[in-house]
Each structure stands twice: as C-alpha cells, then as structure tokens.
C-alpha cells in the first residue's frame, strides 16, 4: 500500500488535525478505540494509507503530533478521539514559541526537531511504500509556521523523493491572534515555495466570511471555522483514501495540478456549505453542486477566481450520482466560462467520483483549483508585511533569536516574485510561442 504520514504542528495544526482524524475515522468506520465497526468493504480497502494495523485489529493513525507547549496536545488527548493516537507520537516542548517564527524555526523548535524526526523515521519504517507526508499547520503563529517549515526542510533532506503536502492556514486580521502574523506568514511562504509539492491554502479570512455571510453565524468560533476545514480536508483526501482511478495518490495529484514547480498553492472549495450540527433538508442536484463548487463564495481562500485564470482544476464528487451527469455539468462549466481556464493547458479539469458521501450529506463536491487569483492572498499578506517592515516594527523579537533582517527582505522578495509568476501565467496565451521569431515586429506593438 502507498502510505501517507501525517504531521500536525502547533495549536492550529493540532486542532484541525484532530478534527481531520475524527472525520475520516468516522468515514472509515473506526471508533475512538481504533476498532472497526463499518458496513462497507470500501472503508477498509485503502485504510492502510492513513492507518497502521496494530494487534487485536486496532487501527492506529499514522499521525505525529508536535507542539512547543503541552496545552493543545493535552486537549487533543482528552478529546473525543484522543485515545486513538499512538502515545509515543506526541512530541512536545514546554517553552512555547510565543507566536514568534524565529523561536519555532531557529531556537526552541530546532531543539525539539530531532526528537520529532525520530518519530517520523519510526513511522516511515513501518510503511510498506511511503508516498509522502502531509502537514497541518497555520502560518500566523510560531510553532506551526516556524517549526512546521523547519520540519518540512528536514524531512525534505532525508526523503527528497517523497511528496510533501501541506494544509496551511493563512492568517487574517478578521480572525487574528497576533499582530506579527504577516511576518510569520511571509517567512513561512518563503519556505513553502521551495520545499513543498502541494499546499492547500486554507484562509481564515475566507472561513470567517463563509461562517458570517453564508452560514449566518454572527460570531464564528474556531470550532465553526474548523468544521469547514475538516469537511474540506476530508474532501481533498477522498481520492487518497477510497478506491478510485483519478488522483489516487499524492504524486498523481501533483502531476495533474502543478504545471510549474513553484506554483503549487491550491484554492480549495466545498459544496454544499453547512454549519455544525445542521441537517440538510434536501439533497442538492449535480448542477447545483457544480455551480456552487465553482462559486467564489465557496472557496476556502479569500480570492475571487474571476480575477484570475485556472491553470488546473480537480473536482471530487461524493455520493450516489450519475457519472454522465457529472461529466456533462463539468463540461458545461468549462464551456460557459472558457476565458477563466488557460487555453494552453488543454483538458486541465479532472473529475473523480466516490460512492461514499460524507456524514450527514447525500452528495457533496470538493474543489481543488490552481488559480492565478491566489496571488490576491499573497498580496494581502505582503501589504501587511511591508507596512510593518518599513518601520522595522517588532523586528527585535526576531533578531533577538539570531535572525538577520536580510532574511526578511529575501522572504518579502520571494513572495513578490511568486505573485509576479502567477501574473505572468495569467496573461500568457497559447499563441505566444511563435512570437519570438518576429523580434522586429515586437517593438511596434
């Protein structure tokens, strides 16, 4: 089997990670003690991707839980599925990172990283054929962002040919813990651009807007935001966890989704959007699902896809439905909105269907888009970064941990380069190839 090792780092990473395991354990019929009580062979067919089989038919998540302070992991341990995790896989410090990227990346995190790598090695050794790693973390804090990116680069060194996939929560002033989030996020993106193969950008701004506007929750809690995250994570990993043909492993997904190595930041979407504990009164039709899935209001990144173009798209439909209808609707979307898909990558939309719907829904659809509009998210963070950095505000917290201002400047320009690269491919057309021969005519244009 092709296994995935899951790592969750920091407070946010552990909270969304714990939710992810609750949701997928439920989908695979695994109870909180790790026993199987399911009703379908499909649930067990690819269970080994995310779970180890222990003695007594117990299924144990291939999960490593990391934090620089014990608090969040204690909550996970005492939470609904806390007993399913392997006790040795909790790795934590006592000092905390104090929302400081430098502490996570260079000082406190660097001291803990070797004990995490020991557990990573142990998990990888129990795999038959490891396909890669997935990390859940946020980019706004200290541990998930600083230590998370440190772990990525260390794992990259040791497993250069394995896929590195992240679920990265982007900070937003609407749901803010700290004022230095733009610093931490920019320093992290600087790392992610170079060291990951696939990054799902889960944007707190978008999650907040969905809760507030669509779900009409006046004061969304982290629990409400995380409900959306877990639905999305369950959706995008469906093809990895259930039998199917399309994007059935991390590498195939990367091959379909990433046309240029640096442009691997995906915009996830989900339909139908429901709030926690609400029941759906009627099942959506396939046309409604398709329409909602491509709607900017359903995107988990606060970017409007109509402001950019799709390089590639993957769609995952779940539930019992007609494949023919799904294909028709997906073609329909592309034909009606052809200007929003780059024409120089033909057939850049791929669709998968899985029979098992998520709990509480008859049908759902998950969207993964590699859109040039994701630059809006990076621009937003870059503007906030620049505002503080030009005054050198709060820098002493970072230089005090041994960082150099130069690293900030490099991170800033790397993120701005990323924005320009997205823009370049947004403007590119299919017939530009021939224009290089006619140098002379170019000047008049």
Curated annotation (Swiss-Prot):
Compartments, record wording: Cytoplasm, Cytoskeleton
Tissue: Highly expressed in neuronal cells.
InterPro entries in the cross-refs: Beta-tubulin_BS, Beta_tubulin, Tub_FtsZ_C, Tubulin, Tubulin/FtsZ-like_C, Tubulin/FtsZ_2-layer-sand-dom, Tubulin/FtsZ_GTPase_sf, Tubulin_C
PTM notes: Some glutamate residues at the C-terminus are polyglycylated, resulting in polyglycine chains on the gamma-carboxyl group. Glycylation is mainly limited to tubulin incorporated into axonemes (cilia and flagella) whereas glutamylation is prevalent in neuronal cells, centrioles, axonemes, and the mitotic spindle. Both modifications can coexist on the same protein on adjacent residues, and lowering polyglycylation levels increases polyglutamylation, and reciprocally. The precise function of polyglycylation is still unclear.
Annotated segments matching region Disordered: 424-445
Protein name (database record): Tubulin beta-2 chain
Ligand binding (GTP): 11, 69, 138, 142-144, 204, 226
Biased composition (Acidic residues): 429-445
Gene3D superfamilies: Helix hairpin bin (1.10.287.600), Tubulin/FtsZ, C-terminal domain (3.30.1330.20), Tubulin/FtsZ, GTPase domain (3.40.50.1440)
A molecular function (GO) term: structural constituent of cytoskeleton
GO biological process: microtubule cytoskeleton organization; mitotic cell cycle; negative regulation of microtubule polymerization; neuron migration
Coiled coil (residue ranges): none
């Amino acid at each position: 089997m092709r296994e995935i090792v899951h790592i969750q780092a920091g407070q946010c990473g552990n909270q969304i990670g714990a939710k992810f395991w609750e949701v997928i354990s439920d989908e695979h019929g695994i109870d909180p003690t790790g026993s199987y009580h399911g009703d379908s062979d499909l649930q067990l067919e690819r269970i080994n991707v995310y779970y180890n089989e222990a003695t007594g038919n117990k299924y144990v998540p291939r999960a490593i839980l990391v934090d620089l302070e014990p608090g969040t992991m204690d909550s996970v341990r005492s939470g609904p599925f806390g007993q399913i995790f392997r006790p040795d896989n909790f790795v934590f410090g006592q000092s905390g990172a104090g929302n400081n990227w430098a502490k996570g990346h260079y000082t406190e995190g660097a001291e803990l990283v070797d004990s995490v790598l020991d557990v990573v090695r142990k998990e990888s050794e129990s795999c038959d054929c490891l396909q890669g790693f997935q990390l859940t973390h946020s980019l706004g804090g200290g541990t998930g962002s600083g230590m998370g990116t440190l772990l990525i680069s260390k794992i990259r060194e040791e497993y250069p040919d394995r896929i590195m996939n992240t679920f990265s929560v982007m900070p937003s002033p609407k749901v803010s813990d700290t004022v230095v989030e733009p610093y931490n996020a920019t320093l992290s993106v600087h790392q992610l651009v170079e060291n990951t193969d696939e990054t799902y950008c889960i944007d707190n701004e978008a999650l907040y807007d969905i809760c507030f506007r669509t779900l009409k929750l006046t004061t969304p809690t982290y629990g409400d935001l995380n409900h959306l995250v877990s639905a999305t994570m369950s959706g995008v990993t469906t093809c990895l966890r259930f039998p199917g043909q399309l994007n059935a492993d991390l590498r195939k997904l990367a091959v379909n989704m990433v046309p240029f190595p640096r442009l691997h930041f995906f915009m996830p979407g989900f339909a139908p959007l429901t709030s926690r504990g609400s029941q759906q009164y009627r099942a959506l039709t396939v046309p409604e699902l398709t329409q909602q899935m491509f709607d900017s209001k359903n995107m988990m990144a606060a970017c409007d896809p109509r402001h950019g173009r799709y390089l590639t798209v993957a769609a995952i439909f779940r539930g019992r439905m007609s494949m023919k209808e799904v294909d028709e609707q997906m073609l329909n979307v592309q034909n009606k909105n052809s200007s929003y898909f780059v024409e120089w990558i033909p057939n850049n939309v791929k669709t998968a269907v899985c029979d098992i719907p998520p709990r509480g829904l008859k049908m759902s659809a998950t969207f993964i888009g590699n859109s040039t509009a994701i630059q809006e998210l990076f621009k937003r963070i870059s503007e906030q970064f620049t505002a503080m950095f030009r005054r050198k505000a709060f820098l002493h917290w970072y230089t005090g941990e041994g960082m150099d201002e130069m690293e900030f400047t490099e991170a800033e320009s790397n993120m701005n380069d990323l924005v320009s690269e997205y823009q370049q491919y947004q403007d590119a057309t299919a017939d530009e190839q021939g224009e290089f021969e006619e140098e002379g005519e170019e000047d008049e244009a």
